[in-house]
Regions:
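Hydrophobic helical h-region of N-terminal Sec-dependent signal peptides
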Residues: 10-14, 18
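Low-complexity, intrinsically disordered terminal/linker segments enriched in charged
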Residues: 114-145
Length: 145
């Protein structure tokens, strides 16, 4: 009976620690304070991706993206991060695609922190591991097939 009580108490304590760890109020406040509203999210993301590539000298005709991970990733007090696969078509029809990490800033938009083109990932497949979480790296590798 005593053994059962100890196991029960450890299960309760473990569940409590898990709940506390997943309800970090600081992380929640950073996400709420920086991620654009659902109504503006997609428009801001497309706008800021287009600006990033335009600033690199690409005359943008269209930008499309796919989320590589749903929702924001919050680490410490940094801006919340999002991970997308992007397809950029220029005005002459050339396509550029790759993996992007973005930071959501002040609910007003996104800043691209890292871009890895499809060709750069193919030439150095481990390069993404320093920037993207392991589950996101797996999704990126799926895109390369």
């Amino acid at each position: 009976m005593r053994h059962f009580i100890y196991e029960f108490l450890w299960a309760v304590v473990g569940a409590g620690l898990l709940m506390v760890g997943s309800c970090n109020p600081i992380a929640t406040s950073h996400i709420e304070g920086n991620v654009p509203s659902p109504e503006t999210f997609s428009g801001f993301l497309e706008r800021d991706l287009a600006k990033y590539f335009s600033d690199k000298g690409i005359g943008i005709a269209s930008v499309k993206y796919e989320m590589l991970r749903e929702g924001a990733t919050q680490t410490g007090i940094a801006y919340p991060k999002f991970y997308v696969w992007v397809w950029v078509t220029d005005k002459v029809g050339a396509l550029q695609e790759g993996a992007v990490r973005l930071a959501a800033i002040d609910r007003n938009g996104f800043a691209v922190t890292d871009f890895f083109s499809r060709s750069s990932i193919l030439s150095d497949p481990t390069s993404i591991e320093a920037v993207f979480p392991k589950p996101v790296c797996e999704k990126i590798r799926e895109k390369l097939k």
